[in-house]
Amino acid sequence: MSVGLPGPHSLPSSEEASNSGNASSMPAVFHPENYSCLQGSATEMLCTEAASPRPSSEDLPLQGSPDSSTSPKQKLSSPEADKGPEEEENKVLARKQKMRTVFSQAQLCALKDRFQKQKYLSLQQMQELSSILNLSYKQVKTWFQNQRMKCKRWQKNQWLKTSNGLIQKGSAPVEYPSIHCSYPQGYLVNASGSLSMWGSQTWTNPTWSSQTWTNPTWNNQTWTNPTWSSQAWTAQSWNGQPWNAAPLHNFGEDFLQPYIQLQQNSSASDLEVNLEATRESHAHFSTPQALELFLNYSVTPPGEI
């Protein structure tokens, strides 16, 4: 048997095989023969890298989501989009062609009659009416709702017409009593709101000017005293107080004028009797007791005596 010499690619010997168990702990030792193989493989790798240069990062394509602004949008095809706008038009026409309930003349008369009596019906009343007219509850309810809307619209139009007519005619504004001043004409109001003094204007109230303030209890009484009729009221001092007889004198003349005319028609004997009575009354009233009685009588109203 011929034993081959160990070459560069020969198998390891038995000693090397026995020591192979400790290869993990000991570093591998390469012989000079192995360096030639390693150098050859390294030169081949360098040549391949030089022949085909590695592309840079700029040359590599970006692996990510495409930009929405640059990349074209992909249209998703769906069966609904393929059908086109024709089917949408058909849907619109189907909505417009909604079934309308056709009422008979008898049903319309019954519904209108009930609407005039009662505009709002309860659930039970609608069910009873629908059973009588052979209609559904929804049909009766819808008819009443539409009728109420028509009635409200008609009332609104009528109100607008009447208001426009009044504006065009230019009707006079309504005068309210609270707008006018409740004070009389002579009572002027200053800018500050205070009431001024009475002016030169007179009180012109038609309700007062036509009325005469007459007291029936006083009209029936005649205040004529024959003892005072011919008495002359002269200025004299009673108890040291001066008495201004000018207004009383004028008042006495006006008051005694009809009585004096009556005396002129009387006889001379009657005149002498009256003069005598006047002297006696003058002498009687010249006393202080009579004067005090006269003053108390003049102050006290006739009804309280």
From Swiss-Prot:
Cross-referenced InterPro entries: Distal-less_Homeobox_TF (IPR050460), HD (IPR001356), Homeobox_CS (IPR017970), Homeodomain-like_sf (IPR009057)
Positions with biased composition (Low complexity): 13-25
Stretches for region Sufficient for transactivation activity: 198-247
This protein's GO CC annotations: nucleus
Region (10 X repeats starting with a Trp in each unit): 198-247
PANTHER family linked to this entry: HOMEOBOX PROTEIN, HOMEOBOX PROTEIN NANOG
Name by which UniProt lists this protein: Homeobox protein NANOG
UniProt cross-references to SUPFAM superfamilies, sorted A to Z: Homeodomain-like
Protein role: Transcription regulator involved in inner cell mass and embryonic stem (ES) cells proliferation and self-renewal. Imposes pluripotency on ES cells and prevents their differentiation towards extraembryonic endoderm and trophectoderm lineages. Blocks bone morphogenetic protein-induced mesoderm differentiation of ES cells by physically interacting with SMAD1 and interfering with the recruitment of coactivators to the active SMAD transcriptional complexes. Acts as a transcriptional activator or repressor.
GN (gene name): Nanog
Keywords for the protein's UniProt record, in alphabetical order: Activator, Developmental protein, DNA-binding, Homeobox, Nucleus, Repeat, Repressor, Transcription, Transcription regulation
